[in-house]
Swiss-Prot record:
One of its GO terms (biological process) is removal of superoxide radicals. The gene is MB. This is Myoglobin. InterPro entries: Globin (IPR000971), Globin-like_sf (IPR009050), Myoglobin (IPR002335). Belongs to the globin family. It is an enzyme of class 1 (oxidoreductase). Its EC number is 1.7.-.-, 1.11.1.-. Nitrite binds at H65. It comes from Struthio camelus. The keyword Kinase does not apply. GO terms for molecular function: heme binding; metal ion binding; nitrite reductase activity; oxygen binding; oxygen carrier activity; peroxidase activity. GO terms for cellular component: extracellular exosome; sarcoplasm. Monomeric heme protein which primary function is to store oxygen and facilitate its diffusion within muscle tissues. Reversibly binds oxygen through a pentacoordinated heme iron and enables its timely and efficient release as needed during periods of heightened demand. Depending on the oxidative conditions of tissues and cells, and in addition to its ability to bind oxygen, it also has a nitrite reductase activity whereby it regulates the production of bioactive nitric oxide. Heme b binds at H94.
Length: 154
């Protein structure tokens, strides 16, 4: 399940492009998540009033949360699988406070790959996409394990 050094390099190379416009990427990812999977919006009390793409696009709060999401994910990805210290507090809040199901982590993982592929098609070919899928799967599996430690079946 682990990634090779080459796969981690592919993940971190494309992640550098994401970080060059983290607000734009984060906003696009959350907008797409809520549009493709409207049920996920139920977990975000402060975004429930955002029912149209126009409202989502205009929301500074949504943009700000997108930065938070991708900043945290970036910290985890940069650990190349050795992310226990970064993952544990994130899993704890997502399990005990926000109660985010693992299925929603799958949804956002799919959306992350779609959005990166749209924004960076020339730099995010099949090999890079496969590496990112593996990295996000590792993240989700480790989150699911931590969820169980916190008593959340998610």
């Amino acid at each position: 399940m682990g990634l090779s050094d080459q796969e981690w390099q592919q993940v971190l190379t494309i992640w550098g492009k994401v970080e060059s416009d983290i607000a734009g990427h984060g906003h696009a990812i959350l907008m797409r998540l809520f549009q493709d999977h409207p049920e996920t919006l139920d977990r975000f009390e402060k975004f429930k009033g955002l029912t149209t793409p126009e409202q989502m696009k205009a929301s500074e709060e949504l943009k700000k949360h997108g930065v938070t999401v991708l900043t945290q994910l970036g910290k985890i990805l940069k650990q190349k699988g050795k992310h226990e210290a970064e993952l544990k507090p994130l899993a704890q809040t997502h399990a005990t406070k926000h109660k985010i199901p693992v299925k929603y982590l799958e949804f956002i993982s799919e959306v992350i790959i779609k959005v990166i592929a749209e924004k960076h098609s020339a730099d995010f070919g099949a090999d890079s996409q496969a590496a990112m899928k593996k990295a996000l799967e590792l993240f989700r599996n480790d989150m699911a394990s931590k969820y169980k430690e916190f008593g959340f079946q998610g």
